[in-house]
Amino acid sequence: MRAPSIFRSVLTLTSLSVGLSFAGVCAQAQDIGVDVGGAAGIFRPKNPEAKKRTNRPSPVVRRGSASRTTGATNAAVEDRIEDLLDKGNQFRDARRFAEAEAAYQSILKLKANSGRAAYGLGNIYSDQQRWEEAEAAYRNAAQWSPSDVDALVALSVVLVQPRTGAGNAKRFADAEAFARRAVQLEPKNAIAWDRLGVALQARGLFNNETEHAYRRAVELDPQFPVAYAHLARVLNRMGRRDEAQPLYERATQLAKDPATLNVIAESLQAEQQWQNSEPVLKRTLELDGKNPTALYLMGRMLVVFKRYRESEPYLKLATEVSPRAFQPFNLLGRTYLALNRFEEAEVTYERAAAFASPGDRKQLAGIYGFEGVGDGYMKAKKKPSAARAYQRALELDPGNKELEQRLAGAH
């Protein structure tokens, strides 16, 4: 059975916590489904289905016929909802996210518990890596439409996107629970089985159950490249590398679209096979030159190899394509920091701060953020600029004694 169309394999930028040392860069990729946002396979959920309208004859409203009037009104509202769903879907496909959001939000004003509208909102937030908003929207969709497997799987995907700070353990456990519900509802759904494997990996479980979930996915759909890549990853982690390599090769052979290629590249990077990810990402960008995940992963790989000038155009374009995503701005700022372009680093970090979670804000205050910018200004003997950067760092991380000392030294 082919993988259901719950998700067209694709991308959206992953939320990766990249530990980079500019003196000797060491990118620490975490497990699939953890830092790689389900490296997983981040999929692009399909659009909510807009029902085909039927040409209903307008009922004749007679005096005193309140029920007929109500029926006509309800029918008009339902037609309006279908129109808005269709518009939202079209805007999303065109990456006109603000207009898509407005369309889906308009549905909720007409029908407050519309699972399809909530699911549509989750999709566009996920496309833009607005993970907290995506989670809230998908949770509404799962609550209002509890048997909607699309919503359950999409929610499981978003929940494995790691966020700096507390709460990841509960989200990963929830991701597993929602994936299990999806498998129970549709036991022959290959993608749901794959997502169950990803959720288990997010919890650090590289065991027989995780392997079984992925093997079930490839049994149900032998043409499912993402599941092959995930199975290869778990076998690698279980020390069965000879079994893993042919599966990576099979995944690459089957991959025909940018999304699937991104998943393979993410998995290779998570295994520290940075160099092997480059040709895969080049294939992706040949197919879709503005694919935000591929742009980010290419920039990330180049930074790992200290090829900062080469990484800049990829990361800049990633910020243009996904202007509300934290990680591309954050890594672009680090790139400028490595190039000693402190003014540009400062501006870029400021833009990242607008989308940063509480945990991310503390990260931005640190050595690979405004503190690093301040240090750079100090070395360049630009004390007023250094003081400004340290002050901004303190605003992001109040009470940090080291930052207070650095600020005092800059005055």
Locations of the language-model features?
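N-terminal propeptides/low-complexity segments immediately following signal peptides
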Residues: 27-66
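Canonical tetratricopeptide repeat
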Residues: 86, 120, 154, 195, ...
